[in-house]
């Protein structure tokens, strides 16, 4: 897995029950995706000078496993679990460093997206080769 995010659960991220509200899990996972795309493909939001392609999330499955409270220190690690014709699947794990528990996981399917046609496009052999270096296949239960 690749370390893609370090965060803290600030008080303003927490609800009246004192734990981090779901909107901030999504934000942290979303930020971590940029780091994963950079690690795997060297891609940043501004790296395509001609503004032709980008990655678009088309499915998120989040499993909230343990409560995150105010002040908890978090890390997100990610791995590429599948390379399809037009999509990749990334599995991310948010760990609470204070108790060493997995707080949440995200399975995300991302398609390569043509910004002009607004449709998914086939992953090139060059991108496939780059991605294959980070592919960690998992069992079907993940």
Question: What are these model-derived regions, one by one?
Answer:
Residues 1-73, 81-142:
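Terminal targeting signals and extreme-terminal segments of soluble enzymes
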